[in-house]
A protein has these predicted regions:
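Secretory-pathway ectodomains
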Residues: 3-914
Length: 914
């Protein structure tokens, strides 16, 4: 009972609640589906589009508003990859309908490969009606390369054995029974993985200067169709939706007829059979990037006669990638003849992931599905208002004497009075563009610009209060780095240095050359700096860092280390600030870490005056050379450590080991005895010394790490116990501090005291992040992203490695709870209550203007933005604060003090006359 009471008190002090009327007041969520792979208009409803996406999502989208009607998130990874989407009844993509209808499950999907799951869905509600699985007796690679198509009510499973043959098996869609007793083996020695594609029931490949194809649904499948290309085929042929045709070498080739049409490589194509009652109509989309226009035309395939009612020229923003026509649906208007009164809706998918609906030559709505794949993000302070900017500019003016300053103050005050008078009359100066958009800094620093960079190269400026997209930029040539390392977003200058604007830089790789690319821009307006803002680097980037010192314009330079270990500074005029700088690189495959010392040599005759010298090297691959680096986590460069010690029960101080150069490195590899081993090393990247190492046996990823102040927290999966565990490590110098002002890794400080402890989590972890505040005074909590889509705010008191296993009496004086292996996960600690984030992948935190409050972004398939207060809002009045009552109390106290003062003075006078 005593321990139960202690636990209850601990949970009461750490939990936080949310009133019903506060839902959506401090947070918002935006839901997405991802980039479309398959899609069709649902003919059972005029307001529903069925889509399957790259994010393993099956969803229905409203054709009127673009909102999600229903959404089913399938299995993650290759198990949930949608290989086929079939919408029963005549669809806008011309899908042929078998003689057998299947009411109640008018949507069929095939996902995964080992096993392949065939499912029937209800398009009205999105509920699963039936399911069957197929486990083919082939190897993993062949199963992954398998494709599916639907023909006359049968599902065909095609397994290509490259360079040999094709294995084709038809199945009944609902029951899963084989329609034929034997699997057909069709000889196809001309097939190759990078030169073949499936279009309708045809399997087409390029072979030198020929296009070869097989109709897999025909009775005589052994007949090979051959078409001359005129030149050697380059790459895989591009299938045309809705028709057995491909686009190759700038031409459209029909596989059912001898038709051949000239076609540009990036032109979108779609064939539809519902516009003119079974007549195949070819729709073609061409983008004019000079004028930002999209031209869509339609021709009858039989005689290539143009359909004038379907010819649109649409404004197509440069923030949208090249389009792909997914589906079309046309109906006859009330006024007319056949073809003359067509009203059409067209579904498009852009290369950047955006989903567009075009109706009668205008874009009806756009869904920015690039936000379903967030690479990195950051919160930026907004600019000052015009009045605050004028005051700031006056205070920053250091020139002149006291009389000049007095004159400027009088002039500015007179100008403020004039503007106030004109504003009262309604004829004041027009507000600035930022003020009209509401992009002005608030008093508490809670209103910020959220800059989000996506994997497709699209950049968004989002209001963190309302969720509005203020600006969008598309960088089609930008991709992430090797080993799935995403693009980097770095802040070179914040909005504090008025009137200089804020400046950020995005670092990535060129999609074609793999050399470094920079995009320098203003994060508040989204406008590029100096021309287009894109800087092409003549080298590949292996490491990135911001310099600590700023130049004359308060700009932090960017230090880059190329693949030849040569240092570069952007801009080059700030090279002098890179002197005596240390960098490191980590090779994930070999487990090697290397340190470098960068020096500035003003007497150098080379173009760059920087020299890079190797300083240390560490091999973390182990004796078996099997260990590979799976994670490398440093500390947040903007964090502040307020308290450098911890008060013990005997009133002594245990000083924290606060090493800003400490990096946590995790390696993982197979082992002959323990199956696999994970090692965690704390490495000083300036001196190259390993401060601490820890080994976990029979442990495997996913691994998530948080490194802050003097502690490290990481989660992993314990394969032996079949559960998720989380380990916390704390480092202390001892009861004497080496140097409390300046830390130097070259002075060989003593090895730290290490406290460590492991705990059990009842649910799998998807992300970890610590809260951060402006001064570091507020207690730090750990935000745990769960596989369920929830985010738990875990107090450090529960993760404290000093929680005693025995003798809890001593620790009770310090307020430390006794050790229990299981960590509680009550609903009260979930910061997103029922606003779950599907496929949660990351959490980003940033300080606000209030020391008590931390801003949080949770991203996955959805976006969720909120704010948390680990130590409550001690610096902010509550919303329900009774201002009327406090006014009455203050008025009464003030009046009483004056009355008492008068009475006391009269009493003193009377006593003096006695």
């Amino acid at each position: 009972m005593m321990w139960a009471g202690v636990w209850l008190l601990a949970l009461v002090t750490t939990c936080s609640g949310l009133y019903e009327d506060q839902i959506g007041k401090f947070d918002w969520r935006q839901q997405y589906v991802g980039k479309i792979v398959h899609g069709a208009f649902d003919t059972t409803s005029v307001d529903r589009i069925i889509v399957a996406t790259e994010s393993n999502v099956l969803a229905a989208i409203s054709a009127k508003t673009g909102d999600i009607v229903w959404r089913q998130v399938l299995e993650s990874g290759s198990r949930g990859e949608v290989k086929l989407l079939h919408v029963s009844n005549p669809s806008a993509t011309g899908a042929r309908v078998g003689s057998r209808g299947h009411p109640g499950h008018d949507v069929i999907t095939v996902t995964g490969s080992l096993p392949a799951l065939v499912r029937g869905w209800n398009s009205n509600t999105g509920t699963l009606e039936w399911e069957w699985s197929l486990l083919p007796s082939v190897d993993d690679q062949a199963a992954a390369d398998a494709v599916w198509f639907e023909h006359d009510g049968l599902l065909y499973h095609v397994v290509p054995v490259w360079g040999s043959h094709l294995e084709v098996t038809p199945y009944q869609a609902v029951s899963g029974q084989q329609a034929r007793p034997m699997t057909s083996r069709i000889a196809a020695s001309w097939t190759a993985k990078d030169r073949c594609a499936l279009t309708e029931s045809f399997f087409a490949c390029t072979s030198k200067d020929q296009l070869l194809a097989l109709d897999l649904a025909a009775d005589s499948s052994s007949a090979i169709l051959s078409k001359p290309l005129g030149a050697e085929g380059v790459g895989r042929p591009r299938p045309v939706r809705g028709e057995a045709a491909v686009i190759q070498n700038g031409r459209y080739y029909s596989l059912r007829t001898d038709q051949k049409l000239a076609f540009a490589g990036k032109d979108a194509a779609l064939v539809d059979r519902t516009i003119q009652e079974g007549e195949p109509i070819l729709l073609r989309g061409t983008v004019d990037r000079v004028n930002n226009r999209l031209l869509i035309v339609a021709h009858r395939l039989r005689d290539f006669v143009k359909l004038d009612p379907i010819e649109f020229t649409i404004d197509y923003s440069d923030t949208l990638g090249d389009p792909e026509l997914i589906s079309v649906r046309c109906k006859q208007s009330n006024s007319g003849n056949s073809g003359a009164g067509l009203v059409c809706r067209m579904l498009l998918s852009a290369e950047d992931g955006a989903i567009l609906l075009i109706q009668q030559g205008k874009i009806k709505w756009v869904r920015e599905e690039a936000l379903a794949e967030v690479a990195t993000a950051d919160f930026l302070d907004l600019t000052l208002s015009d009045a605050e900017g004028a005051i700031e500019e006056e205070l920053n003016n250091k020139n002149g004497d006291v009389y000049g300053a007095f004159q400027r103050r009088i002039t500015s005050q007179a100008l403020h009075l004039k503007n106030l008078f004109l504003h009262i009359l309604g004829v004041g100066p027009a507000p600035s563009k930022a003020q009209r958009a509401g992009l002005v800094r608030d008093d508490f620093g809670l209103h910020k610009m959220l800059v989000v960079v996506t994997n497709s190269g699209k950049v968004f400026g989002i209001d963190n209060v309302s969720g509005k997209h203020h600006w969008i930029r598309y960088l089609p040539s930008f991709v992430g780095f090797a080993n799935n390392v995403p693009m980097k977003l770095l802040v070179q200058r914040t909005s504090r240095f008025y009137p200089l604007p804020a400046q950020c830089v995005i670092v990535g790789r060129d999609r074609m050359t793999l050399n470094g690319l920079l995009y320098i821009f203003n994060p508040i307006t989204g406008q590029p700096v100096q021309g287009g803002g894109v800087v092409e680097l003549p080298y590949s980037v292996s490491q990135i860092s911001l310099l600590h010192k700023t130049g004359p314009d308060f700009l932090k330079a960017l230090l880059l280390l190329d693949d030849k270990n040569v240092a570069h500074v952007v801009p080059e005029t700030l090279e002098v600030y890179a002197d005596n700088f240390y960098m490191f690189t980590a090779n994930h495959q070999t487990g090697q870490m290397n340190g470098f010392h960068v020096q500035y040599n003003p007497s150098s005759t080379k173009a760059s005056k920087l020299t890079t010298t190797p300083s240390w090297q560490i091999d973390l691959s182990g004796g078996s050379k099997r260990q590979q680096i799976i994670a490398c986590e440093g500390k947040n460069p903007i964090e502040h450590v307020h308290s450098q010690g911890r008060v013990m029960a005997d009133r002594s101080v245990l000083y924290k080991y606060i090493n800003p150069n400490l990096v946590a490195v995790a390696t993982h590899g197979a082992d002959n005895i323990h199956k696999y081993i994970m090692n965690v090393h704390l490495v000083d990247v300036v001196s190259g010394s390993i401060v601490f190492s820890m080994s976990h046996k029979r442990v495997r990823p996913p691994l998530h790490m948080v490194h802050s102040e003097n502690w490290l927290v990481y989660s992993y999966f314990n394969d032996k116990a079949r559960r998720t565990e989380i380990t916390s490590i704390e480092l202390y110098e001892g009861k004497t501090q080496t140097n409390g002002t300046v830390w130097s890794s070259l002075d060989a400080p003593p090895l730290p005291m290490v406290e460590r402890q492991s705990y059990i989590l009842p649910v799998a972890v998807s992300a970890l992040k610590e809260t951060i505040t402006e001064k570091g005074i507020t207690s730090k909590h750990i935000l745990i992203g769960l596989s369920t889509g929830a985010v738990a705010e875990m107090s450090w008191a529960l993760l404290d490695p000093r929680r005693p296993v025995t003798s809890p009496e001593k620790a009770r004086e310090e307020g430390i709870m006794p050790y229990m292996p299981e960590l509680p996960m009550p609903h009260e600690i979930l910061v997103n209550y029922n606003q779950t984030v599907a496929n949660l992948r990351g959490i980003h935190t940033a300080p606000s203007g209030l020391e008590s409050t931390c801003l949080v972004l949770v991203h996955g398939l959805d976006l969720f933005v909120t704010r948390v207060s680990p130590s409550k809002t001690f610096d902010l009045l509550k919303e329900d604060f009774d201002y009327f009552l406090i006014t009455i109390v203050l008025t009464a106290l003030t009046t009483t003090s004056f009355v008492v003062k008068q009475l006391a003075s009269k009493k003193i006078v009377k006593q003096a006359w006695k």
